[in-house]
């Protein structure tokens, strides 16, 4: 992992009705994967995964890519959580996170790693849940 640029996640949430929009956004993002910016675009997950109680897919990217990624996320019409990847998993998903689109999703914070531990680092840029 690079040490000069902070790692970030974006979680794109969808419903049965908005699944096609999520799939289209995912395909657009897959076309832009690059080792210096957008590293990973996960599969559409149709069930609860980690703290995410509704269907979603996630992207891994470096902070420097955020200005290029935000227009796509802001205009997709879906609820999106963008957050840094730090050693405080709870803060990442709450106070450090930024919600776009619809109303924030109530996350299951009980499953997050304790402060000082974040298993997300090991899978950053490689795999989703």
Segments predicted by a language model, with ranges:
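Long, contiguous binding/interaction regions
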Residues: 1-129
């Amino acid at each position: 992992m690079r040490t000069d640029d902070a790692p970030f996640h974006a979680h794109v949430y969808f419903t049965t009705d908005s699944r096609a929009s999520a799939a289209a956004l995912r395909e657009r993002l897959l076309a832009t994967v690059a080792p210096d910016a957008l590293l990973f675009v996960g599969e559409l997950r149709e069930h609860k995964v980690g703290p995410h109680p509704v269907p979603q897919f996630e992207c891994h990217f470096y902070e420097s890519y955020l200005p290029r990624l935000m227009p796509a996320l802001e205009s997709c019409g879906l609820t999106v959580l963008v957050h840094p990847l730090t050693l405080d998993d709870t803060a990442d998903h709450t106070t450090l996170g930024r919600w776009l689109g619809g109303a924030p999703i109530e996350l299951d914070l009980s499953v997050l790693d304790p402060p000082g531990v974040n298993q997300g680092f090991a899978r950053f840029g490689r795999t989703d849940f």
